[in-house]
UniProtKB/Swiss-Prot annotation:
Keyword set includes Hydrolase: yes
Motif (JAMM motif): 174-187
CDD domains from the UniProt entry: MPN_DUF2466
Source organism per UniProt: Stenotrophomonas maltophilia (strain R551-3)
Alphabetized PROSITE patterns for the sequence: MPN, UPF0758
Pfam families hit by this protein: RadC, UPF0758_N
GO molecular function: metal ion binding; metallopeptidase activity
Protein name (record): UPF0758 protein Smal_0281
A GO BP entry: proteolysis
Residue sites binding Zn(2+) per the record: H174, H176, D187
Domain of life: Bacteria
Length: 234
């Protein structure tokens, strides 16, 4: 049955207007981006087909636009619409960190942003947020990329980037493609090495977030960061 023949309260657009976007299923939300169906199936059925064959939702939407365009029912126009929607969501979350407020005072916003950037990635990515002396965001960079199990991390490069940005503080993050956000012993070891290396140039490590499924794990919240050491000189 075409969507326009459905009861009005069950049509995705009307349901969203009446009850809000959280009332819609993944397939119904995706159908609103598609606009119409494919191969004799309506937009919701097409969305369900895509999710069943290529999902779940994050796996489907993590694909590059050129790869999405090759999937049945999408094509260049719809894949670009989906990619644009994701980029808007990314910029919306980034805006929480980019309006001159102290990032270090808003760990929830940092966690949401990093979760959006890193969760569901097929390989490990190591990122750094560089902050000024009032803990406002200067830059956010992906520094290292690895395999499904690990990304090589070089403290010297992190320090170099911090100095380049004249950063006073840094927040680190990486993802676990396995989905388990619990820090490993290697995570703890490299965090300690990075904290010591940054301290040598008077840059403070505020936190290290590990992103997987669910809520990111914060080293600072867990008490896993070493206390700042007093400077010997100066």
């Amino acid at each position: 049955m075409p969507i326009h023949d459905w009861p009005e309260q069950e049509r995705p657009r009307e349901k969203l207007m009446a009850r809000g976007p959280t009332a819609l299923s993944d397939a119904e939300l995706l159908a609103l981006f598609l606009g119409s169906g494919f191969g004799g199936r309506d937009a919701v059925q097409t969305a369900r087909d895509l999710l069943q064959a290529h999902g779940p939702l994050r796996v489907l939407l993590d694909r590059p636009a050129r790869e999405l365009a090759r999937l049945p029912g999408l094509g260049p126009a719809r894949s670009c619409t989906l990619a644009a929607g994701l980029e808007l969501a990314h910029r919306y979350l980034a805006a929480e960190l980019e309006h001159g407020e102290a990032v270090g005072n808003n760990p929830a916003a940092v966690g949401r942003y990093l979760q959006h950037r890193l969760r569901g990635q097929a390989r490990e990515i190591f990122m750094a947020l560089f902050l000024d002396n009032r803990h406002r965001l200067i830059a956010c960079e992906e520094l290292f990329h690895g395999t499904i199990n690990a990304a090589p991390v070089y403290p010297r490069e992190v320090v170099r980037r911090a100095l380049l940005h004249n950063a006073a503080a840094v927040i680190l993050s990486h993802n676990h493609p396995s989905g388990d956000p619990e820090p490993s012993s290697a995570d703890t070891r490299i965090t300690d090495e990075l904290q010591q290396a940054l301290a040598m140039v008077d840059v403070r490590l505020l936190d290290h977030f590990v992103v997987g499924e669910g809520r990111p794990v914060s080293f600072a919240e867990r008490g896993l960061l070493s206390p700042p050491q007093p400077r010997l000189f100066g």
